[in-house]
UniProtKB/Swiss-Prot annotation:
Residues 2-218 form the Glutamine amidotransferase type-2 domain. The gene is glmS. It comes from the Bacteria. It is an enzyme of class 2 (transferase). GO terms for molecular function: carbohydrate derivative binding; glutamine-fructose-6-phosphate transaminase (isomerizing) activity. This is Glutamine--fructose-6-phosphate aminotransferase [isomerizing]. PROSITE patterns: GATASE_TYPE_2, SIS. It is found in: Cytoplasm. It comes from Chlamydia trachomatis serovar D (strain ATCC VR-885 / DSM 19411 / UW-3/Cx). The active site is at C2, K601.
Amino acid sequence: MCGIFGYLGEKNAVPLVLEGLSKLEYRGYDSAGIATLVEGRLFVEKAVGPVSQLCSAVSSDIHSQAAIGHTRWATHGEPSRFNAHPHVDMDASCALVHNGIIENFQKLKEELEEQGVVFSSDTDTEVIVQLFARRYKETRDLIQSFSWTLKRLQGSFACALMHQDHPEVLLCAAHESPLILGLGEDEVFISSDIHAFLKYSGCTQTLASGELAVLRIGKSIETYNFELARIQKEVRCIDHTEDSLDKKGFDYYMLKELYEQPEVFERILHLTCEENGFTESFLKGFSLDEIQSLHIVACGSSYHAGYLAKYVIESIASIPVYVETASEFRYRQPYIAEHSLAILISQSGETADTLAALNEFRKLSKARVLGICNVRESALASRVDHCLFIEAGLEVGVASTKAFTAQLLLLILLGLRLANHRQVIAQEDLAQAIQGLKDLPNLTRLFLDSSIHDWRCRQIEETSFIFLGRRFMYPICMEAALKLKEIAYVEANAYPAGEMKHGPIALIREGTPVIVYCGDRSVYTKTIGAIMEVKARKAYVIALAPESNRDIAAVSDEQIYIPDSHDLAAPILFTIAGQIMAYTMALQRGTEVDRPRNLAKSVTVE
């Protein structure tokens, strides 16, 4: 997984590509590289570590009209200079950058080795450029050789290629992996992420799966399918801003994005709610008739959002909800009943496992598919029957904060909309719920401005934490435990509070930190019972509870109080508490908050 960035135009390509790579670094950051042409010959520079290392290695005297670059998150071959992209052929005449996994790379590699090709890396990517180079030597036809190469690849990929015989041309292609073109005046950008070139262009074309593009200086983009049939593509121009890439005085993107949550909530509520009901635009054109079950499919944090949605929607809309991990869904031959609705959740809209699950849904049933994502230009948004956007703006921190809580809010609103459509919720209860959610932005600001940021973990030297919650709080505990793993590198596990006695209580010893979420009023006393169980075994209990439940201090070692709220808003506020706790513990442990080891923001490979 990685970020791809390329430039072709009248300006100096090298600093533009280095700048673009810096903006893509959150997608992969174990190594980086750039390729360009200097005096008619290919020039390639690579560096292990952040893009700043690459910038230091590249001379500022290099001027070129074309360049391609890459930030890497290793999937084939360890992080190293020789495995970093761009990769070149044996003659160093062409260079290629690639995102994805080539599933038949071993077979292709053996075929090329039999023809005398010597490989210089452990990656599947090098197979592509060596295969292309062999074909180009035979045909001397740049575009035909590229098409022929692409058709031999199995797997998911996006790539960009340059050849020293054609200094005015860049080639790029996409197959089940994102690639976006930005169009300026006599210039074009190639990127894995639209935000990397928005400073220069808001006019875009997105390569669909199975498409390649030929870019030439001063000429319009030529788009083809892999059989070289010409495709006419529309240019989409959007309002664009770079504000999201500015930390705005915060030390970390994660902290900035934590504080942006109230504004995100306000945007969602403005688009979906009015008075005591819903706006006409919310789910406009998407019928909720005859839906008899929901299948929610997602990965990571989005899966936890779906898990909460199951609890909420079943309780308020009286409809069965099944939640699936996307990476498992496609392999287990699930039964999809008639009149089911599939809901696929992905922040980026490019999560490979989730897109694969979408393909599986299409094969298994005629169920309609609703998408929930953050990126309008994404593959998910283009392939589902209807898409709800979480309006979170660019999220740079690898550990999701505002995107996750935006998913929660939108899913809760979807549950209320469904309950109202099915006439299983009293109008008074609906009005109270909507008002409770409308209170959420101000309650979030109140909490973010409270003493929560003074909290420090007294058990920071412990290597294992347990999270407990019941009902709505259990999925939120799952997310809190994930956050601790992601950025503090601490082993953390979440359990339903009632399950402790069925096994996990064996892990409790004196001083074991147990973080208990006591935010669901309907099971508050039951949750207190779980606290008593672990306290009897001398666990160290950190209790999170509403402000009105200060009696929790009598049975816990530490307390974090959350503003009182409506039952449907509470999971979101308790989520934010978990985000702040994980952030604080990461600082205490000295880990990298925005770029945790081994993780990438957008998981575009299976």
